[in-house]
């Protein structure tokens, strides 16, 4: 179960680098579209961050929770899980073209992309490159999305590629309003993420 849990979250949490925005959004809710566009443009400038928090996973046959560390530096990522979810530790590092998953006392797994690693290890297909956007409170730009804005013109929820993401609370860090608690619901999988510490950065291109 440990390997399944670790790969499940880390693959969802993976990313394929930061791309540009599309115009494939359907907006609804109480927010102002112009304020949303300004908010989205500000968050798109973030190409680096460090996150510390907790993650919970619920699947039909098993569930678990643990701590999360996520370091993002443009297209490089270092994602680590520890605690009851892992009964040890797991670390995922990579950039486009190469991904390495290391699981304590179980082994090392490599692939050319997070999607390929997930398919190889579990036989599952998930939009694994989307969370780099979702964790910032943004829709992924490469597919259609349905967005519900809250009264502050931030995301209250989004539907994209068969996944539903709920934004339960936000926190302000260095002038950025960033998700603090979010829930992801997909087919046979629920993920809850609670960010305890956000350190957003603009690294430049």
From Swiss-Prot:
Annotated GO CC locations: cell outer membrane
Endoplasmic reticulum is among the record's keywords: no
GO BP, sorted A to Z: lipoprotein localization to outer membrane; protein transport
PROSITE patterns: PROKAR_LIPOPROTEIN (PS51257)
Residues linked to a lipid group, N-palmitoyl cysteine type: 18
Function: Plays a critical role in the incorporation of lipoproteins in the outer membrane after they are released by the LolA protein.
Name by which UniProt lists this protein: Outer-membrane lipoprotein LolB
């Amino acid at each position: 179960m440990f390997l399944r849990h670790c790969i499940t979250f880390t693959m969802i949490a993976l990313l394929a680098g930061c791309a540009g925005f599309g115009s494939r959004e359907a907006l609804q809710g109480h927010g102002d579209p112009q304020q949303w566009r300004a908010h989205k443009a500000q968050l798109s400038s973030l190409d680096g961050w460090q996150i510390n928090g907790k993650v919970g996973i619920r699947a039909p046959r098993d569930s678990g929770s643990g701590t999360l560390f996520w370091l993002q530096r443009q297209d490089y990522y270092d994602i680590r899980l520890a605690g009851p979810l892992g009964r040890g530790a797991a670390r995922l590092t990579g950039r486009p073209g190469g991904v390495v998953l290391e699981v304590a006392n179980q082994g090392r797994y490599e692939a050319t992309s997070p999607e390929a690693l997930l398919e190889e290890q579990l036989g599952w297909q998930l939009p694994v490159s989307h969370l780099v956007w979702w964790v910032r409170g943004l829709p992924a730009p490469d597919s259609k999305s349905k967005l519900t804005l809250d009264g502050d013109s931030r995301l209250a929820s989004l539907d994209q590629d068969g996944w539903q993401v709920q934004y339960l609370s936000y926190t302000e860090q260095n002038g950025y309003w960033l998700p603090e608690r979010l829930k992801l619901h997909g087919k046979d999988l629920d993920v809850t993420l609670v960010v305890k510490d956000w350190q957003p950065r603009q690294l430049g291109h």
